Amino acid sequence: LRALVASNLAAQSAEQLSLAAVPIVAVLALGAGPGEIGALATAQTLPFLLLALPFGLWADRSSRRWLMVGCELLRGLSLLVMLVAALAGQLSLELLALLGFIGAVGTVGYSVAAPALLPALVPPAALAQANGRLELARSAAFAAGPALAGALVAWAGASAAFVLATLLSASAVALLWRLHEPARTPAAPRHPLVELRDGALLVWQHALLRPILLTAVAWNIAWFVLQAAYVPYAMRALGLDAGAVGLTLAGYGAGMVAGALLAPRLVAAMSFGRAVVFGPLVSVAAMAAMVATLRWPQGVLAGASFFLFGFGPIVWTITSTTLRQTVTPGAMLGRVSAMFLTANMGARPLGAALGGLVGAHWGEAACLWLALAGFVLQAVVIAASPVRVLPHLPATPA
């Protein structure tokens, strides 16, 4: 487990460094505008929608550890090519988009295989704690990565950020090499579409998995409605400059770290079902705080809102992932993980488009109220489900 946690920290740090460094380099070195930055972001997002399900099948048919090794090597190779191109002065927007796509392919495979591998490394009773350690690593990388990338590019140029990201990716591979994966009995090969159908039916027909999926989709739509409106709202209505907007957004990363640190105590202090519902309820409180800025336009209130948005959902991620891993048969963990990833990523552009449409026609305030409605909906879905009354984790399926 220690090797997986350390590898995850290195891989997440490499990802966050590169995600932050690429648009900075594109603007400073290549004169990219909003359209080009949007195209780069699209290139880094498409693999999640196109390849998560194939990677889920792969993770259920072969070694999950070696899938992670291969995918992290692919991401490391894309970072190395970025580094060489930066040193040679040969970077272009087209090359950044291509390498961003390739690197994201590696990220997808790693992201699908890691939660599928974890239940084989720890007993069911230790799953929540293990997921907490993985999420703490992700939270730390998310909180520190963008600031570190910006500082490196500003002080030492683009190559410095790519050097560090490449070294971190190589470290992630080395740590995975040391990890021992218990042998699994290979399943009889079947048509891929049949296996995907079985995974989808399991999620949709399961009394615990379906509300978790619907809650996550509703949360992502509401979150990206808010994201579409927040920066212009903060600058126009709250009177914040760029630096102050950045400080309010930094509350999100701080909340993630705090939530990951406190999650074990929170889970131990209440029934497991209530611990799962805790995160969605905190999201409602967070959005209510943001809506309150319509009456009291204070940046501190917006920062507190983002802190809560980091704090509650990280507890949700830990508890809901643990529940998902516990009730899913081991042979289907890869497909189920991929389906959740695909649904969540698919909800994001829908939320962003909805937020943009509402904001353009009715203003940022309407977006805030719409986002609040979405967060209330996701809390109602999970609170009205059988998940809420779980006293503890259910038994692991055979």
Segments predicted by a language model, with ranges:
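Alpha-helical transmembrane-bundle signature of multi-pass membrane transport and export proteins
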Residues: 1-398
